[in-house]
A protein has these predicted regions:
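Short alpha-helical transmembrane segments in multi-pass integral membrane proteins
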Residues: 1-19, 76-143, 174, 189-244, ...
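N-terminal transmembrane alpha-helices
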Residues: 7-38, 42-43, 59-71, 75, ...
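Transmembrane helical elements of multi-pass membrane transporters/channels
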Residues: 17-33, 137, 171, 204-208, ...
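Hydrophobic/aromatic residues within transmembrane alpha-helices of membrane transport systems
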Residues: 24, 36-40, 51, 76, ...
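Helix-terminus/linker motif at the lipid-water interface of multi-pass membrane proteins
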Residues: 27, 31-49, 118-125, 181-192, ...
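Alpha-helical transmembrane segments of multipass membrane proteins
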Residues: 34-38, 108, 150-154, 177-184, ...
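Small-residue-rich hydrophobic transmembrane alpha-helices
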Residues: 48-108, 145-164, 275-341, 346, ...
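Short runs within selected transmembrane alpha-helices of multi-pass transporters and secretion channels
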Residues: 69, 73, 138-156, 164-175, ...
């Protein structure tokens, strides 16, 4: 039954060697993001909720960029297996152009109409007032972040995930130090509060971009070919749109859907407490899921390269099944660790530091239990969508599997329970488990079918 787990010697070592730098990168980013939330939370739960609301449109930008990054990786990982560096440059050029244009448009909208953007998320005018200066500044930081993220994604796709780990580590360290200095007014700087958090984010993105651009100029593995970067050609643009558009649509729809969860919460009773609980529980969960996305991204590189070098469909299916089961078991252990850490460390010692109300703390606990309970399914579904299906070029199926449960099941149920029936908030929190419960059986059928294996570098 599990014969597919018998892979060639060194397969699992290669998987975890690729995943480890990505996991470390995710842990650094998430841990320092948790510290970021913690430092803003020290100003008060109202300030923390305002920043969470302000980050909803930022989250959409991040998801669009991640979609472009992932869509580029679908092509790059297979071109890497083929050894076609010129085509890799063409893909990067298209990704940089689109990412830079989209992030600039968002930044301008948030700079000139910040309050209008925030009013789309919440009707709490106090949160809008606090979040307006934050969103006006932080929007520009994601122009630089979008460009560096596309390049870092390329390096990950050519089996160099360590680069992203180092760049994001330096960036997030800069962000944490900047937060401490600018939020609380240390080292002679004025205490800027929420505005200081935005300024620190902008500074960290400048550092991130400078490191990525400097490395790109010196990289010899895939050296920059300016003619290919600036003139990628119509054929490559057609292929990029064909394979990347569904991934971009996937991440955009998923990002908008997840942002609507915050919007729904923002229009419920006790919205401030509910959003604060969601922010803290989500930060805790992201620490655990850092490992899941490390496995998923490593799987995308391995699957894509395997198909790119011309391996058989059967070989691709065996690898897909092996990495999905590995992710499921790994996530099962992560869920146990999350619960143990919450009971022994976070709940008694860390949560009180956030100054949450009793109701918010109770809702936070319910959310953490739900996140930990579905962690194994989260591991399987994320690796199946981000790693296996995308790595295999099956981008349309991954679009449907990733978004149908969220848009057609989870969000309607949340609207019904939270806005119509107005159930207790603790009961509403249980809805966050629905998405992964629904994805798993459909994903299993798709993986076993083998219809997801497509050699997109030879499909001209």
């Amino acid at each position: 039954m599990f014969s597919y787990l018998r892979q060639p010697k060194g397969f699992y070592r290669r998987l975890f060697l690729l995943a480890l730098p990505i996991i470390v990168q995710n842990l650094i980013t998430t841990s320092l993001g948790f510290l970021d939330t913690f430092m803003v939370g020290l100003l008060g739960s109202e300030q923390m909720s305002a920043v969470t609301v302000a980050n909803v449109p930022i989250f959409i930008i991040q998801l669009i960029v991640f979609g472009l990054q992932s869509g580029s990786s679908v092509l790059i990982s297979q071109y890497w297996g083929r050894g076609d560096r010129e085509s890799i440059n063409r893909v990067i050029g298209i990704g940089l152009c689109i990412a830079g244009s989209v992030s600039t448009l968002f930044a301008l909208i948030m700079a000139f109409f910040p309050a209008d953007v925030l009013l789309l998320v919440t009707d709490n005018l106090r949160l809008v007032a606090i979040g307006t200066p934050y969103i006006r500044i932080v929007g520009f930081s994601y122009i630089l972040n979008s460009l560096s993220s596309i390049y870092i994604g390329m390096q990950r796709s050519i089996e160099n995930p360590r680069f992203g780990m180092l760049v994001f580590g330096a960036s997030m360290l800069c962000n944490t130090v900047g937060n401490y200095v600018l939020i609380f007014g240390k080292l002679g700087f004025p205490a800027l509060g929420v505005t200081g958090a935005a300024a620190a984010t902008l500074l960290s993105r400048v550092v991130e971009f400078a490191l990525a651009f400097g490395y790109a100029l010196r990289c010899r593995t895939v050296p920059l070919q300016w003619s290919a970067l600036l003139r990628p050609g119509r054929e490559m643009l057609r292929r990029f749109i064909h394979y990347s558009a569904p991934v971009l649509a996937n991440e955009t729809l998923w990002g908008v859907g997840y942002s609507l969860i915050t919007v729904i919460m923002g229009h419920m009773a006790a919205s401030g407490d509910l959003i604060a609980a969601y922010t803290v529980a989500g930060s805790i969960d992201k620490l655990s899921t850092a490992g899941i996305y490390g496995i998923a991204n490593a799987a995308a590189v391995i699957v894509g390269k395997e198909i790119g070098i011309g391996s058989s469909r059967e070989s691709g299916v065996r690898i897909g099944k092996a990495v999905c089961l590995t992710a499921f078991l790994f996530a099962l252990a992560l869920g146990g660790v999350e619960l143990l850490a919450f009971f022994t460390l976070l709940r008694p010692y860390v949560l009180p530091l956030f100054s949450l109300s009793a109701g918010a703390a109770a809702m936070c606990a319910v959310m953490v239990y739900c996140y930990a309970g579905v962690m194994p399914l989260h591991g399987f579904s994320s690796t199946m969508v981000v790693g296996v299906l995308r790595g295999g070029g099956d981008v349309r199926a991954s679009l449907l599997i990733d978004n149908f449960p969220l848009w057609c099941m989870e969000l309607p149920l949340m609207c019904l329970l939270g806005l119509v029936l107005k159930v207790p908030n603790e009961m509403f929190c249980l809805c966050i488990a629905i998405e992964h419960l629904a994805k798993t059986p459909v994903g299993l059928l798709r993986i076993h079918s083998g219809k997801w294996v497509h050699d997109i570098t030879r499909s001209e």
